[in-house]
Amino acid sequence: ACNQYGYTLALFLVSTKEDEEQIFPRILRRGLLDGIVIQSGHHGDQAIIGRMVDAKKPVVVAGRPFRSDNVSYIDIDNVKAACQAVEYLIGLGYRRIATITGPNSSTVGIDRKEGYIKALSSHQIAIDPALIVEGDFTEAGGYAAMQALLPARPEAVFTASDIMAVGAMRAVRDAGLRVPNDVAFVGFDDLPLANLSAVPLTTVRQPVVQFGAKAVEVLIDLIENGIDPPRYVIMETELVVRESCGAKLRG
């Protein structure tokens, strides 16, 4: 997308506070960049975003930031997508539906958990705290979270990422149970591994390629037409039904 509009892409990996302190002053002082896309959604990113906004730099945040009233961002409707995924499980007849959430320090984790709760509540299904475990978007985290959930005997699990779903399904198999016969799963992201897992994963597909291209389009709009008012773009998702949800067993 950058090449299409005659811009050059520069990539900066900022994984620590030290990285932030070294990289961003150079960007601001030397005028190296016309604009910046920040991959966000974590509470700790708010300071970085704030510095860019205060400097009146064109900024697009990929992933809704915690404070979004004065900065442009592009995202999906995580609440709606999670709600639709859980409602699909409810439609298959599951009632003891657990969730492995994302970190509570991220808007993604918070929003997808909210969607899970919204779906259950709209169908008058009681919210059981024993069926909600916080994860960390890693396979190991998904495995550990599923081990914590197994004593609560969930019929189905909505995981906030495919990577955690892979770990969680492995924990189910290691416990001598079967997917989806004993525990069904729905993930989130539709990464390539979703279709390559031992049991192909039903999951929410994000428009990853379009997401990046749209972020660049919005950034160029900010550069060429001014940063006010902020632009907000919500991309669509879709549920991809595969074997892990048990639809064939229940259909």
Question: Which residues does each predicted region cover?
Answer:
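Flexible loop/turn connectors
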Residues: 145-251
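Hinge/beta->alpha junction and helix N-cap segments in small-molecule ligand-binding domains
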Residues: 11-20, 42, 74-84, 100-147, ...
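Glycine-rich phosphate/diphosphate-binding loops that line cofactor/substrate pockets in enzymes
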Residues: 86-97
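Alpha-helical recognition/docking segments in bacterial nutrient-uptake
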Residues: 1-87, 151
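Short acidic/polar active-site loop segments enriched in Thr and Asp
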Residues: 33-34, 94-96, 155
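Short acidic capping loops at alpha-helix termini that bridge into adjacent secondary structure
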Residues: 95-97, 127-131, 179-184
